Amino acid sequence: MNNELINDKINILVERAKIARDEYLKLNQEQINSIVKAMSMAVQENHMLLAKMAVEETKRGIYEDKITKNIYSSEYIYHSIKDNKTVGTIVDNEEEGYMEIAEPIGIIAGVTPVTNPTSTTCFKSLIAAKTRNVIIFGFHPSAQQCSVATAKILLEAAVKAGAPKDCILWIDEPSVDATKALMNHPDVNLILATGGKGMVTSAYSCGKPALGVGPGNVPCYIHSSANIETSVNDLVLSKSFDNGMICASEQAVIVDNDLTNQFEALMIKAGSYFTN
């Protein structure tokens, strides 16, 4: 697809998003809370199906762990934000003479990874709806189908609960160029980017607010006072979860000298390998 056609498609999505953005402004806190609850419950009802789709399409990860991530991104995230005030006056401090008023930022570009496609789509959709923001997704090309399925479930639930019909949109023909065009569109107000280093760097280079999440170098320090068996067990469980694709899983371990031999023996016993 050439750049002109890509830009035309992005422009159409953004124009639809503008209408939904204006419709969101008419909703009150109670209505927004009902919408977010409905979206969360819809994903919870389909968490196993979406996990299966993610593993089959991407050929990555572990089915049971994808289930856990879908439950976390729907149920846990919902309960962590459900009582937050996000509409109108959220703070009225008469003593210090100030008020805080919550307003949506507008249109969000949501970039999702191949490693956590369904759970990231759910999470970003929930926080966008909670804050009355329209989100347009640029899904990873290798996870398009499972990501679209998740977005459709969320959109249907949201609209039934009273949300604007285009509150969740996505690029139908995904590509790096299409995602970059979305992020750089002048009417996109915020970028939520989860992906590889290159994509996150691109998001930060767009000249607008961007929140990026990418691979991290996560160290773990095991002190001599630690329960070494528990520490090793936790490390192996964490690093092997969903075949180690979580950005926040441990990448390096620093161990006190007097624990080195015991640590290495327990790691090998747990099925780990030392490559150098």
What is the predicted function of each stretch?
Residues M1-M99, I127:
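N-terminal Rossmann-like NAD(P)+-binding subdomain of aldehyde/semialdehyde dehydrogenases
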Residues R21, V36-M39, A109-V111, I136-H140, ...:
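Short glycine-rich or small-residue beta-strand-to-loop segments that form or flank ligand, phosphate
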